Amino acid sequence: MTLEETLEKIHPADKTAMEAALAHWNNIAMPLHSLGRLQDTVVRIAGMTGNARVDLKKKALVVMCADNGVVEEGVTQSGQEVTKIVAENFLKEKATASILCKKAGADIFPVDIGIATDSTILQHKVMYGTNNMAKEPAMTREQAVQALEVGIHMVEELKEKGYGIIATGEMGIGNTTTSSAVTAVLLEQDPAEVTGRGAGLSGTGLKKKISVIRDAIALHKPKKEDPIDVLAKVGGLDIAGMAGVFLGGAACQIPVVADGFISCVAALCAIRICPAVKDYVITSHKSKEPATMIILEALDIPVFLDCDMCLGEGTGAVTIYPILDMALAVYGGMCTFSDNQMENYVPLV
């Protein structure tokens, strides 16, 4: 689907399916809402899929891999070559996300949407890395749309293969810089308030990073009311690709799990493009990056975990898969009040 076709297919979650799922939970022989957010999330997933019979047996992680030209400004501790190394390690089960996926019973799909050199992972390359946003726009508007459509395509493909839920992840040196820039614009924040040390910058490095972001925003003047313009001028291909996954999930009625800071920025972009996307987003954890709480407050979707994680790659998103499996085991397998010939609990007024 094109971006335009995708947006036409996005509708709010199915309230009838949500009501049916809630009624089933209330008939299960346990105190009402005693599994808390686990129950709420299953109800939300029923609304996303339009079916109270929730099936998440096939689970995926899509990792958007791309380089960022802004690394030329010295805003990272690691060199650009690390992006390709880690991206190819996903397929060798030598990266954190791939190891967690194996344990969680999920399949990983690393996508080369913009690595600076050729790679051996799934190819949907829009550019060989973005331009240096300190000097010129990161990409054209057309390239930003193309990156969004890569994410949409991935969801369509995975739906055809029977996947019922998709987690989002990324790999790209310099992407906390681009994510902070996008956040600063969309949420009208000073860059100093939404910029962290990334993978381990010194105090001097952090000041440089903040300065680069502030100058890039002043140079390009991205329009906060136009998320695609923001992505094109100060964003990254990985962010745009993940935003496309969120858009595609909403259009295809598949729940999409946000990971940490960068993934949540992508979710924010998708929701700003189409507000109904919010109904299809599950947030997994609270990252250590300073902007995370600001973004989560803007998204207004409760998170599952607070484990001080900040690795990226989709690691936090995949970590909630076993929790969802346990929730669904209760939802689908536990006896009801009628099975036990017991009276239902009555909600307190």
Named regions from a protein language model:
Residues 2-349:
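N-terminal loops that bind phosphate or other acidic moieties
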